[in-house]
Amino acid sequence: SVGFKAGVKEYKLTYYTPEYETKDTDILAAFRVTAQPGVPPEEAGAAVAAESSTGTWTAVWTDGLTSLDRYKGRCYHIEPVVGEEEQFIAYVAYPLDLFEEGSVTNMFTSIVGNVFGFKALRALRLEDLRIPTAYVKTFQGPPHGIQVERDKLNKYGRPLLGCTIKPKLGLSAKNYGRAVYECLRGGLDFTKDDENVNSQPFMRWRDRFCFCAEALYKAQAETGEIKGHYLNATAGTCEEMIKRAVFARELGVPIVMHDYLTGGFTANTTLAHYCRDNGLLLHIHRAMHAVIDRQKNHGMHFRVLAKALRMSGGDHVHAGTVVGKLEGERDITLGFVDLLRDDYIEKDRSRGVYFTQDWVSLPGVIPVASGGIHVWHMPALTEIFGDDAVLQFGGGTLGHPWGNPPGAVANRVALEACVKARNEGRDLATEGNEIIREACKWSPELAAACEVWKEIRFNFAAVDTLDPTA
């Protein structure tokens, strides 16, 4: 009979629709689902679709006041995971009308909201999202993008070099500025505030900004190269964050920085809009990402966080090193590096890319390799990341036995040697160590660095790995 019928009914009756053909305007999601014992995959997949869109636990009278068929999420495909009895991939399509234009915050509140605490699921992980071009076009995206950044900096044909100032906490503003000057003077393109440097009692933000700007201008005058220091504008409120960005602009520096996950997507998008309007580049640090993305069965993969960042806005984002001290498997890392840089990325499950993604005209983001890397890694980094990357050596610069400027010189010489060798057709993967040794003959600074770090390795297996193929 027609009319309202109270009670609880199975999700799959409404939300599991294997016959559904996805639309170009749908947001598509791939979830790794671990259901509770006894919950069939169709019901679990439908529950994910329901709880992340229009559904609730019981039939409600007000369902009759809207068109559920128009607004509901749909689980349209379920795929087993090879070697995992209890896991499967559920594909869900969401109609575009469910999401506010230009708001990553709203998109995530639905797709990775309450559903992650749902009792019928033991664990849930969002592996990938397909953002339709209609939704992409509602975002500004990165303030400037890769080409505009190169033009602003007048640096072409090689990766950029950076250094995080250490110790990350405890230096006075003047000593901090001195380290910035020494690194930039030695040949680096950028230095960086650590992500946890905001405005603490030992160094207030305004003092740091002033001394870093002085260091930057002095290094520029002496080297004839454009230099940058990522001034961290992250703050406790959006108003304070913008105040710091305004002061950075008044100092005339080229780039500011934000911690986009701890700061939040609303704050990040606000800052990205300010940066485009005022000609500032925006460096993004991903502090807190491993809380969300490191476990293979629960949370959200970093490729989703990377896509969200490209939509929200940032010119650089940390993306792992493959070879350093932090988590990151090569194929997976290259998968999301492409998602950050390229306009069009084909589906490629061998690199963890579940959907073809078309970014239309959204600018690209430069991936930043940072964390436990040093001069011996330079050939591998140049080969893995190519030219459009920032290679950041914190301890690998400041840990040089002769001090900061020689540490910077060693990194710049190693990079120039690798780029030259690559351009001459040499294979960096097989000849890397030899290329670095040859360069040592012309650079005592590089030779000293090579001696210090010749035995350093971080050999641990990655936690987050690709699924085996059948």
Curated annotation (Swiss-Prot):
Chief subcellular location: plastid
PROSITE patterns: RUBISCO_LARGE (PS00157)
Cofactor: binding comment: Binds 1 Mg(2+) ion per subunit.
Keyword line: Calvin cycle, Carbon dioxide fixation, Chloroplast, Disulfide bond, Lyase, Magnesium, Metal-binding, Methylation, Monooxygenase, Oxidoreductase, Photorespiration, Photosynthesis, Plastid
Listed GO CC annotations: chloroplast
Domain of life: Eukaryota
Chain positions found as N6,N6,N6-trimethyllysine: 5
Residues of the site described as Transition state stabilizer: 325
Keyword check for Chloroplast: yes
Annotated catalytic residues: 166 (proton acceptor), 285 (proton acceptor)
Keyword Coiled coil: no
GO biological process, one term: photorespiration
Enzyme class label: lyase
The EC number(s) this enzyme carries: 4.1.1.39
Additional remark text: The basic functional RuBisCO is composed of a large chain homodimer in a 'head-to-tail' conformation. In form I RuBisCO this homodimer is arranged in a barrel-like tetramer with the small subunits forming a tetrameric 'cap' on each end of the 'barrel'.
Assembly mode: Heterohexadecamer of 8 large chains and 8 small chains; disulfide-linked. The disulfide link is formed within the large subunit homodimers.
Name of the protein described by the UniProt record: Ribulose bisphosphate carboxylase large chain
